[in-house]
Amino acid sequence: SRMISELDAVVIAVHSLAEAADDYASLLGQPAREEEFRGITSVRFQLANTAVRLVETDERQGLKQLIFACPDTASAQQRLPKVGLEFVEAQSGDRFLSLQPETTRGLNLALTEKDTAGLDYSASESAIEGLDHAVIASGDGDLTSALLSARLQLDMRLDLTNPDWDARLLFFRCGDLIVEVYQPIAKPLSPEQDRFFGLSWRSANIDATNAELRARGFDVSDVRAGRRAGTRVCTVRDRTHGVPTLILGRD
């Protein structure tokens, strides 16, 4: 069985927790739940296939951490050091493993045993239903691929270089969503280190979602054809607190 079952949460660092909580409640169409997370105040939103967690920062806003659901953290704790991944602090009994960024190409990643208590989720037809993909920007797709597929055992589904997009794209399945690695070609990033880029949210009815977000005061682009066949997308241009944000629907 795979070490990682799904993406438990995406963590977004924001300057104002109150303001960001309002914005993400409007964006996601879900209530904000205030709760403690790793000793600090956070706000959580539950979606169909993952959660969004907001935490306050004095540093740059944006996507800060991916937390993977791992059914057996004890065996992961045994296995990961053998493939070169180290932990920030492995508190026994805590069932939350933060990986040392020096061993994960600078990315802030963690594994946790999923606590499914109280994960109620319901949404209107125009609401965002879940995450479609989380995007990592990479200077070296091969090394990032080794991290995600060889070490973390995510299933690689696609490795595509398209000069029209000036990019190499690698897709890794995680539960029912995708961790996408985006490697720019013309202006490459530094090969040593990756960084989190953006989030693409899934909508069952993108025209309704687009209209709803405009009605809630978001600056949203028109719906256009997506890169993947049979998809349509629009860009959310404000109130996402440093996270490049796309909404994706299927025809």
Language-model-derived ranges and their functions:
Residues 1, 77-130, 161-180, 200, ...:
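Vicinal oxygen chelate
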Residues 1-18, 61-68, 112-145, 151-152, ...:
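N-terminal beta-strand motif that seeds the catalytic metal site of vicinal oxygen chelate
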Residues 2-4, 11, 16, 43-47, ...:
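Short, low-complexity cationic-aromatic patches
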Residues 2-5, 9-50, 76-83, 88-95, ...:
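Core segments of cupin and vicinal oxygen chelate
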Residues 46-62, 66-70, 88-89, 112-115:
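DNA polymerase sliding clamps and clamp-related checkpoint/processivity subunits
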Residues 52, 118-121, 184-185:
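Short, flexible segments with low predicted structural confidence
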Residues 55-57, 67-71, 79, 147, ...:
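A structural feature that tracks compact, well-ordered secondary-structure segments
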